[in-house]
Amino acid sequence: MARQPIKTIDPNVDLSSALKLPEELPKPWDAATLFGRSAPLELEIGSGRGLFISNAAGQFPHHNFLGVEIGVKYARYCADLLIRQHRTNAIIVCGDAALVLQHTIPCETLTAVHVYFPDPWWKRAHRKRRVLRPEVLQLIESRLMPGGTLHFWTDVEEYFTSTLHLLAKTTTLQGPFEVPEQEAENEMDYHTHFERRTRLGGEKVYRAMYKKGDNPKEG
């Protein structure tokens, strides 16, 4: 299925309530200041068109959701969607997720990290650009609270198997745990737009969930 072009958001629309730059985030980190309340915090790396973060924020109103999207056009699209759907418990950061994890999010503050259909960077020479590289996986592990979870989905088998190998080699996260495919009754029942396009095209989606132990090993 062909990818539909993303809508350009009017530059005059005020998105400031749902769209931040990394330098606009509280320092030192204070999620209660950012969201106006204290609540369990979930992070999505690469929010794309915003289907997951918008649906999750609506489904779990007692959680806060922070999405990090490096593409300016996509970040603005996500923020506009969150505002239109009144998702006051979700905010998009336009920036590099690795840098946000490293410089802004403290250790053991996230209840979940979601990474759905990241860019596979097909050429072998470009794979070092993948978001789920060893140093980022270690950052994710350190930022998860004990009992926190990592959710990773992709339609690229090589990316899936190599990432699972890296997780086993570079982290102490428990898993992978199987994630069963949920039947979709309508087009909004998919996790992301990419999942919808992949499944409707008859292609396989690879899914895994990992959990941080209550007493994770040091190092």
Task: Report residues per predicted region.
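Conserved beta-strand signature within the Rossmann-like core of class I S-adenosyl-L-methionine
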Residues: 146-154
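Class I S-adenosyl-L-methionine
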Residues: 162-165, 169-219
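SAM cofactor-binding core of SAM-dependent methyltransferases
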Residues: 40-99
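Class I S-adenosylmethionine-dependent transferase superfamily signal
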Residues: 113, 140-141, 150, 163
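S-adenosyl-L-methionine
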Residues: 1-43, 51-58
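Conserved class I S-adenosyl-L-methionine
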Residues: 126, 154-169
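A short acidic, Gly/Pro-enriched loop at the edge of an enzyme's catalytic core
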Residues: 103-112
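A short glycine-rich, Lys/Arg-flanked "PGG" loop and its adjoining helix->strand segment in the class I
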Residues: 132-146
